[in-house]
Amino acid sequence: MTMKTKRIASLLLAVAMLVLPVLPAFAAEEDSYTYVALGDSITTGVGLKDTHFSTTAKSYDVQENYHDYSKDCYVARVADALGLDRDHAVNYGMPAAMSSNILDLVRTGSTASGVAYYDLPTLRQELADADLITLLIGSNDTVLQLMGAMGRATNGKATKLLIPLLTGTMRELNLQTLQTLKKGLENLDLTPEELKAALKLLDSGMEEICDQTRGQTVANVEQILQELRTLNPDAQIILVGYYNPLPFLPTYGRHFRLLNRSVKALAQQYGADYVSIPYTSIANDGHPTVCGHKYIARQILKAVRK
């Protein structure tokens, strides 16, 4: 071996010695990429096969679903596309959660009040360590207010019908669903006063509820984004917009158009990426179908920077 050849070999060996220790570090860094999904029952995957949740005295038990969620939900599809296993992609979808509940969770790790009570002591640290965070929250703010108002207008009679509709019991549009719905409507047995109050609510009352809740939803989403940025200045945050879960109600269409416009502006303000999902395919219960989840995942993946 000539002196020149020896020098070249020595140089290559030195470079190899410098590079080789770095390669495992890159692999470890790749392995440590984590995704945390925050949201309500849409994120949970309610209505999909193999979604794990059950009712409890206080709320819903979804602990098993944090990691063992349906392969058809948008969280799974995003995780799979990014090559993440279930230890690196966590589904914190909370059935019945409102924006105020998620705000409590990111601030303290538990929900202070509301329909849904959840306790996630490790959440804040997981958010601080995450590389990607998706947030889809706010639809329930208006839906639950509407349910409450309809229950009061009908002295609780309508609630018995609304709960099965919204929890997936009558998810599929088939003969059995139509028969169940027909029977439920017949059994309402509303008095003339209750019927008048219900119709008034569906007419002008709903618009009032939407206008009242929209401002609070926007304020809560802004505070969630502030808290996420404080916890993790470097993570990519994707703020997912809203589809109309009740397309047969025109007032809701206007409400979600205005809400999308507001949260899109918030995303820009806090360095987040806004994703629009207006064409989500939904079932009778207002939750996305398998195709709907595919669509949401595609929209999110278009925005992911990995």
PLM feature segments, named:
Residues 6-18:
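Sec-dependent N-terminal signal peptides
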Residues 19-31:
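Sec-dependent signal peptide cleavage junction
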Residues 29-69:
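Short glycine-rich His-centered loop
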Residues 34-39, 43-45, 88-93, 131-136, ...:
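Structural recognition of the beta-strand scaffold that forms the well-ordered cores
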Residues 54-189, 196-203, 207, 211:
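Conserved SGNH/GDSL esterase-like catalytic core that processes O-acyl groups on lipids
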Residues 215-219, 227, 244-276:
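Substrate-gating cap/lid alpha-helix
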Residues 264, 284-306:
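Histidine-centered active-site loop/cap adjacent to the catalytic His
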